[in-house]
Amino acid sequence: MNNLRVRFAPSPTGAIHIGNIRTALFNYLFSRSEGATFVLRIEDTDLERSSKEFEELIFKELEWLGIEWDEGPDKPGPYGPYRQSERLEIYHKFAQKLIEEKKAYRCYCTPEELEEDRRKAVERGDIPCYSGRCRYLTKEQEEAFIREGRKPVIRFIIPDDEVIEFEDMIKGKITIKSDTLGGDMVIVKSDGMPTYNFAVVIDDALMKITHVIRGEDHIYNTPKQILIYKALGFEIPKFAHAPLILGPDRTKLSKRHGNTYIGQYRELGYLPEAMFNFLSLLSWSPEDNVEIMSKEEIIKKFNFRRIHSANPVFDIEKLNWMNQQYIQKSSIERIVDLAIPHLRRAGYIDGIDDMVYNWLKDVISLYKDGLQYVAQITEKAKMFFVEEVEYSDETVKILNSPNSKIVLEVVKKVIEEADEITEEYVKDLLKKLQKETKVKGKEFFMPIRVAITGEDHGPELVKIIPLLGKDKVINRLKKAINLIK
């Protein structure tokens, strides 16, 4: 490890959004490709919404995806603690320092006063910003407000007419004027909790973070943070703002686009290596433009300069295609193990012994290469787990085609007489019955397929029939025969 340090700093207030996971991934890839230290920090100052359950979920999702951190709440390092709720004294110390150096002050404005200021600014056609009313309060004025029971916030003084410039590692030079930042900003709330922009600067500085890699929705936080860095005499890190992920309609990815949390994809049976691969390609591509890559290959090829500034689109079809490639390369045992919870939830299976497990392997292997995600197995293989199959109008038409009844009755009769149904037996049987009935090809196979499966396409009949078993096959043939007019 060298002196480079990056961090991922999520808030444990809910499930992790795809965009946040992509941010974690870029920090991780930077750390592993550059030999940097990767820090996990939990920003839990929102006491009402933060929970231990969501913190545990953060750990779980990162570990599932294969993102390991070097320092964090569960991996002590030299710059802990790594939860903001355990660092409150540190923030108060630096807030007091800013007050003593006349770079911050206590503000006693009421919400009503602030709302009135905002309303007047809007009426004038101005951008609402804090008026600075409390910037120069006398000691007597402060004491009077305290006697009234007002609880102050602490505001950091935003300099007038200053231009803040920084070189973004992705977007290039960014220039923002201080008079667009909303006036003197709150750094400590009336309940004593630090605001995001204040706490993040203190933490990044004291944890010696050299590169801040985050989403572009933080761009307008950066000049505020740079001013705090300067006021406290801290070294300013390098900044990189990754473009936000968009939905197919090129608006910010949200719930209306479908699943937006990483856990939803894990639960559906997307493979972690596929998600790792897919997310790494949202705004980045290797020089050779290869798409399917292992984690190790991605780390080896990763170059931060190849992250582009255009907003990537979350293409679910591309993800499904990529996940399908990984499912195809996975062992049948792995896919069966992932499928079992889905089959249990569907009520298809209960206890599993070796015989059932081996049967599941045979069933799932019929569909494995066509699965885009593992949860699809409950629908694709449904016919193996239900007693009866349903017939659509289209499949009923097939059952009522010429010669269907003859074919189904002769197949039923022969299977009823069979002692054991194996693939070899079914293969020979179907060949023999085509000769006997003089019905061949689709005209012979389609009624059987529809009768037994309820579908007009799917895996080979010679594989389906032995796996369904004699009783199910006979019962379904009987039902189909009774439907024929």
Swiss-Prot record:
EC number in record: 6.1.1.17
Chain location of the short sequence motif 'HIGH' region per the record: 10-20
Residue pairs linked by disulfide bridges in the UniProt entry: none
Catalytic activity: tRNA(Glu) + L-glutamate + ATP = L-glutamyl-tRNA(Glu) + AMP + diphosphate
Keyword field contains Coiled coil: no
Pfam families: Anticodon_2, tRNA-synt_1c
Binding site for ATP: 255
Record keywords, A-Z: Aminoacyl-tRNA synthetase, ATP-binding, Cytoplasm, Ligase, Nucleotide-binding, Protein biosynthesis
Source species, domain of life: Bacteria
EC main group: ligase
Subcellular location field: Cytoplasm
Main localization category: cytoplasm
Quaternary organization: Monomer.
Family assignment from sequence similarity: Belongs to the class-I aminoacyl-tRNA synthetase family. Glutamate--tRNA ligase type 1 subfamily.
Protein name per the record: Glutamate--tRNA ligase 1
Organism for this UniProt entry: Thermoanaerobacter pseudethanolicus (strain ATCC 33223 / 39E)
